[in-house]
């Protein structure tokens, strides 16, 4: 049996809302910190036990600004879990509204990871600053864009109209983030209320349209084309277009949309490497995507600037199924600029056997 004052037992009593049992335990031994450095206040706030929270503060004078090993305070816990009564109690007791946890997250940032407008409003009305950024350069609006709740985005823009004018440390905007995560309604709000450049780029030259395509969010890609005049053939810093990025991630529907719907050349090459979408798909072992590209007319014999065939990249990646498909589709082994055959790049017995079978047949 756990001894009185055992931190795990005390936390369990708080979690289960057993105030009377907790009072008896604390009369014997004042609570210790838990294994993560949590106080009982952290535990009460995390689990929404406002009555216990009040008891610990008022009867035991526990410090509402106590931090755990991640520098979280009870307000962080209550805000992140959406426990409005605990948030309001702590704010009413004078808790610091913009306290920082590890990685410089404020309670408002943590609240924006949940779709709980009331908690966000309470924090803002008590002075929380939506413009503060965490260590990655994200402010609360940016975090809310990832979650994609349009009501919260509209509220933050109402109380802080410039909240959208933000970039992360790698120059990604909330529009990039909402597009990548497939948050269609959020993207609609951002296009209606904010003023992002049509093809704003991050440090890698990636646009929101590319993000939408490479993650398979075709409806968002269409919206960006129609309402934001995005460029479907824009290239990133490596010269790769949306088609190439979709091939990497195996987004076949997006590839069909680009080629059949927008007329993008299925064999368009990345400027720096002269790789085609077929090369990118083979490099990643995206067998279904290789099949899709071939069905759309991709040139199976295309080579890059080093005269590497699609087979070279499939073999270098040790992709058995992809290599087999290419051989079955009629692609023959050939030398690159260094005189290396594709089969020389593989360690796979299965792939080498496929080459032997191809030669014999």
From Swiss-Prot:
Q: Spell out the subcellular localization from the entry.
A: Cytoplasm; Nucleus
**Residues in ANK repeats:** 36-66, 70-99, 103-132, 136-165, 170-200, 204-233, 238-268, 273-302, 306-335
Gene3D superfamilies (alphabetical): Ankyrin repeat-containing domain
**Superkingdom of the source species:** Eukaryota
Which keywords does this Swiss-Prot/TrEMBL entry list? Answer: ANK repeat, Cytoplasm, Nucleus, Repeat
UniProt note: phenotype after gene disruption:
No visible phenotype. Loss of Ankrd16 in mice with a 'sticky' phenotype (mice homozygous for the variant 'Glu-734' in Aars/AlaRS) results in early embryonic lethality. Conditional deletion in postnatal Purkinje cells in mice with a 'sticky' phenotype exacerbates the 'sticky' phenotype and causes widespread protein aggregation and neuron loss.
Give a Gene Ontology cellular component term annotated to this protein.
nucleus
| An example Gene Ontology biological process | tRNA modification
Q: Which InterPro entries does this chain map to? A: Ankyrin_rpt, Ankyrin_rpt-contain_sf
Q: Where is this site: Required to capture Ser that is misactivated by AARS/AlaRS?
A: 102, 135, 165
The UniProt entry, under SMART domains, shows: ANK (SM00248)
What is its biological role?
Answer: Required to prevent the misactivation of serine (Ser) with tRNA(Ala) by promoting the hydrolysis of Ser-mischarged tRNA(Ala), thereby playing a role in translational fidelity. Binds directly to the catalytic domain of AARS/AlaRS and captures Ser that is misactivated by AARS/AlaRS, preventing the charging of Ser adenylates to tRNA(Ala) and precluding Ser misincorporation in nascent peptides.
**Domain comment (free text):** Side chains of Lys-102, Lys-135 and Lys-165 capture Ser that is misactivated by AARS/AlaRS.
What name is this protein filed under? Ankyrin repeat domain-containing protein 16
Q: What organism is this sequence from?
A: Mus musculus
């Amino acid at each position: 049996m756990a001894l009185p004052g055992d931190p795990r037992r005390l936390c369990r009593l708080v979690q289960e809302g057993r105030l009377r049992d907790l009072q008896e335990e604390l009369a014997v031994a004042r609570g210790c910190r838990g294994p993560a450095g949590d106080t009982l206040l952290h535990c009460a706030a995390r689990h929404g036990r406002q009555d216990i929270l009040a008891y610990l503060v008022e009867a035991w004078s526990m410090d509402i600004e106590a931090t755990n090993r991640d520098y979280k305070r009870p307000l962080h816990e209550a805000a992140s879990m959406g426990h409005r009564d605990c948030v309001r109690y702590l704010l009413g007791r004078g808790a610091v509204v913009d306290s920082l946890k590890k990685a410089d997250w404020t309670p408002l940032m943590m609240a924006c990871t949940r779709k709980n407008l009331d908690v966000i409003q309470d924090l803002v009305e008590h002075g929380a600053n939506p413009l503060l950024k965490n260590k990655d350069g994200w402010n609360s609006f940016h975090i809310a864009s990832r979650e994609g709740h349009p009501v919260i985005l509209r509220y933050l823009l109402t109380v802080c109209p410039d909240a959208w004018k933000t970039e992360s440390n790698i120059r990604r905007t909330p529009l990039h983030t909402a597009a990548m995560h497939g948050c269609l309604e959020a993207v609609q709000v951002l296009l209606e209320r904010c003023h992002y450049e049509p093809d704003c780029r991050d440090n890698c030259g990636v646009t929101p349209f590319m993000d939408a395509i490479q993650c398979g969010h075709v409806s968002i890609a269409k919206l960006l084309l129609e309402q934001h005049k995005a460029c479907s053939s824009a290239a990133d810093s490596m010269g790769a277009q949306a088609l190439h990025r979709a091939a990497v991630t195996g987004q076949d529907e997006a590839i069909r949309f680009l080629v059949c719907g927008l007329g993008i050349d299925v064999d368009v090459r990345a400027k720096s490497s002269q790789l085609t979408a077929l090369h990118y798909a083979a490099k990643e072992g995206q067998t279904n995507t290789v099949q899709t590209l071939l069905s759309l007319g991709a040139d199976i014999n295309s080579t890059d600037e080093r005269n590497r065939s699609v087979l070279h990249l499939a073999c270098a990646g040790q992709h058995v199924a992809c290599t087999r498909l290419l051989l079955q589709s009629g692609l023959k082994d050939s030398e690159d600029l260094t005189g290396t055959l594709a089969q020389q790049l593989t360690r796979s017995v299965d792939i080498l056997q496929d080459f032997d079978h191809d030669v014999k047949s």
